[in-house]
Amino acid sequence: MFYGHHHSYSEKPDADKEAIDDLTRQAKDQTGVMATLTRARVEQLKAEIQAERAFSKGLDRSQKQILKTINAALEISSPSALLNLSPPEFSSLLLNGGLGEAIDGYIDQQNRIMKSIDKVMNATAPEFSMNSIEAQSAAIQTQNVSAIFDDLIVPEISAAVKAGLTDIMLFVPVEVAMSNMATKMKSSRGGQLNAIKTKISQYGRSLTAVAAEAADLDNYLFTGPRDGITRKFCRALVDLVVDEKQMSKLDNGQGLSVKTSCGGYNCRHSWSPVSEGFIRAANLQKAKPKNIAKANAGAR
């Protein structure tokens, strides 16, 4: 989703709670369509945070299962034979050995996020249905799974397993090699989960962007926490509406798309597609050139 706090995964989870509490307070102070939208955003943020935490637990279980799988494989095969497996065969070993379960669990979390986005769209465009972008949603879901597992998780786990198998082949005791394997997997977790947190947020934002295009909405309300730990880029935009032309001029300074990454890595703010009717009903303010310039000046 598109929220704008910017903490690393290793920081205390209170940062997520602060973002939820901030938005919840906003919803209580609001009325009508704006309150409905903010409540929907709270649900989406909760769904994304739940996805992050469930992913962490699922990956932990999968890595432990992979270690058991490799241990069992070594009882009937040699480390050199396992190292000689083709890339597809080696990936299959990891998937069937525990990683597949983590993928299935993440897809379940993706579906929860999609349902929360449906509520967001219902708040701003009641006539729109996510069913109308089923094909695009499936493509985004597949791409997101690939970006997380194929690009981040599988290479790290493969490297750790192959390093351990090489150690065993060089006569390092199996117990020592397996322990080193587990340590290597664990050491990569921090960076992985931080990147994954951003990928999960980008998934929700990408779905919303496609939904907005399908619903012919080209105005976006920037919503999210208003507290003091919010990026200057985000603080300059909170509660303002930008159009597509203004969106293209925004630069978060991190080389990431503003539409799908907002303020950048780990951002907890969001873009909500809104119609002209919604803008009038909620008495929203449209961003001016000075607001865009101020946001860009605060980017980092």
Identify the residue ranges that each predicted region occupies.
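Acidic, glycine-rich two-metal-ion catalytic cores of nucleic acid-processing enzymes
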Residues: 185-287
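N-terminal leader/targeting and assembly helices and adjacent pre-domain segments
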Residues: 1-193, 199, 203, 274-300
